[in-house]
Amino acid sequence: MQDVPLIPLKVLLGNPLHSSAKVSPDGRYISYLRPSPDKDVLNVWVRSRQAAGGAAGADDVMVTHDTHRGVRLYEWAEDSKHIIFLQDVGGDEDWHLYAQAVDSSSLSRDLTPFKGVRAENIITDPHHPAEVLVGLNKRDPRCFDMHRLNISTGELQLDTENPGDVVAWYADADFQVRAALAMNPSNGSKTLRVRQGPDAAWSDLITWPQEEEGRVVCFAKDGRSIYVTSSLGRDTTELQLLSTDPAAAPAAAAEALQDMPARGAVAAIQRQTSGVAAAAAEGAGSGPASSSSDPAVLSSLASSEKCDVGEVMVDRLQRLPLAVGFNYLRQEWQVLDPSLQADFQLLLSFKGADADLSVEARSLDGSVWLVAYSRDDAATEYCVYDRSAAAAGVGAAGALQFLFMNRPELSSYQLGRRHPVLLQARDGVTLPSYLTLPPLPSIPKSLLAPNPEPSGPGAQGWGSVSGLQLPLVLFVHGGPWARDGWGLDSTAQWFANRGYAVLQVNYRASSGFGKRFLHLGDGQWGVGTMQHDLSDAVAWAIGAGIADKERVAIYGGSYGGYACLAGLAFTPELYCCGVDIVGPSHVRTLLGTIPAYWAPMKRMLVDRIGNAEGDDALNRRISPLYHAAAMRAPLIIAQGANDPRVKRAESDQIYNALKGKGLEVQYFLYEDEGHGFARPPNRLDFCSRVDHFLAKHLGGRTEPPLKMQDTSVVALHEYKSLDDYKPPGAAAAAAAAGAGDSSAEGGRAAAVAAAAAAVAGAAVAGAKHGGSSSSGSGAMGLGQKVGLAVGVPAAVLAGAAVVVVAVLRGLSPRR
């Protein structure tokens, strides 16, 4: 890799120059997150749409003024005059809701200034621009009552009291709270309750048993029906329209369907180069026809046989779903409104098959869209789309205005390609996965070139031509009820740039692939099939000649950190080192210390993980803490002191069990962080330490240690000081690579070429990285989710805007 420049950690993993771009409801302004010029802290910037193109200029104004953690979750208020955003203290996730006038230099106002109280489930409405609805656990820390809040005056009034089991609230077109999602603590089921008015009694509309999936999208405009996604009667979720009063279903159906645009065949917009792209269109009907015997189901609108419903683009004035995204391996779209067919065709044609399209935001009237193009080997591009210009026939070049790239510095570097691969577990279960390979300046003619359009799915056909193998990092996503996806993953690119192959596996229990795949992971932590899937993926990479079996690292955060500890404890022969970020080590103490507001979901956690609190044998079997004696590989442990989900004790106890055993164990505690590392000094300090740790054990490249001035790290133990660290010598690295080349770089380049050649037989096909899913990047608008991580650690360590569970509801579906 001597011809591939080393990418500095700050370029890959520092704060992005631009992120979370949005358009104001009136379409006049563009907003985005950008570091402040003096503190490198993310804040909200605003520019007029007339000055949209290019990098920040004189028209751009920084409207928030955070100086420490930065703003990560924000939205426009419906008046287009205020920004509302959430902020916690030191990663404790006790979110406060703030408001900032965009035309004022005054400090932001804390609208929920209550100590120890968390704000979430925030709903806005275009017909009530002065108000928001917000959930607060002020009365009872275990549950959230809905309050009505005036943005300008700060007046707060109780709207709807929580009976104790409601985990999410929804408002209708009149801005009245009329639906609630309740959890049954006895069996883990979810019930959607509705009422016909603010003073009416609640009634149960639909129940999803613990093994089923369902969520609310929005009320229809008529208030007599509601859009949901549901897996009842099928494996993957589908978009459905339900009557909120089944007794009046025929009348509600006639009225709701009359409001919907006339549809011919539902259009599936996809790339022909995608090997499994057609799967996203399966289940697309010829119009809004019911496919369920449930009298509440008025129509079934969109579905795929391969994956669940992803993001839903909604007309917020008419309260109609316009298009639906599906993400199996890459993003595909089903367009429900025929008037948007030409728009999507134009937008998708602009970048072709090399990029995935997401609609980040829309003006209230739908005339201005803010779209993003994600690639696996380049920065994300944001553009402003003018529908009126497109209608005038000017084409993509005239209707699309380039806004900016999230990390423009990456344009100077060569990045690795991210290959979707369908792996097979030992029991035949298919595991959608992603393999990122180090970049090559060129592919030697003696090797097979990568094939961008393989003929069929699967992992057959991969293999090493030269016989040289790469070090491998198995990068395990958190959740575990989340997923990895396609697109730029800065953490994977960091490893690839250092000379490592990177394998990311959607193991069973990952979300988005249907309820069967999700629940195959129930009770399978640690020594079960969830961990077997990871081991099988490593075995595939070794067997295919991609990975050197002596140099495999396991890296992950949250559940991924648990998987790291489990891998080192239960399959110690497989890994030469590991990195555990905020990972639980003792399942009983994890379940016993969940946040109070997770109490309604406790039964769901027990059903999915196992009753480790009541079954001592199970707890001992799946908790890495009890198997510390089996660990023999070097390990880094990293923890945020204020983590409310995986408490500091989880890292303390595994470190205490390992220290003094003769192992190389390094433990880094960040005192002003929570479930991930939001502050760049801490993030870069951590990544620099990992950079050198992996170089030592995998033989890759590294940059000199970073000396961060404002980090909160406490190094509880270090095997070697970074000041004394010396990278492996060239001869040692070459020997480790198994190469005859006397140059370490020569051996690495040959191994890279061998792995690149193996691409020839892999199945590649598509889904936008991050999307509304996992990885979190578009987490605005999601309600409270329970899981060890949503979109971490990849988003956290890549400096993305979201590092925690997203807590704004009603700001999504996509505008």
Regions found by a protein language model. Name each.
Residues 19-22, 41, 72, 95, ...:
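Non-catalytic accessory segments flanking enzyme active sites
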Residues 48-52, 102-104, 150-154, 196-198, ...:
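Short loop/turn segments that connect beta-strands within beta-propeller blades
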Residues 27-30, 83-84, 132, 178, ...:
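Hydrophobic beta-strand positions that form the internal "hydrophobic ladder"
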Residues 33-44, 65-71, 82-98, 105-130, ...:
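A flexible loop/linker signature enriched in serine peptidases of the S9 family
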Residues 504-733:
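Active-site-proximal cap/loop segments of hydrolase catalytic domains
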Residues 8-43, 369-370:
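Beta-strand-rich domains and repeat architectures in extracellular enzymes and scaffolds
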Residues 406-553, 557-558, 563, 592:
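Cap/lid segment of the alpha/beta-hydrolase catalytic domain
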Residues 1-18, 57-60, 343-353:
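A short helix->beta-strand "capping" segment at the edge of beta-propeller domains
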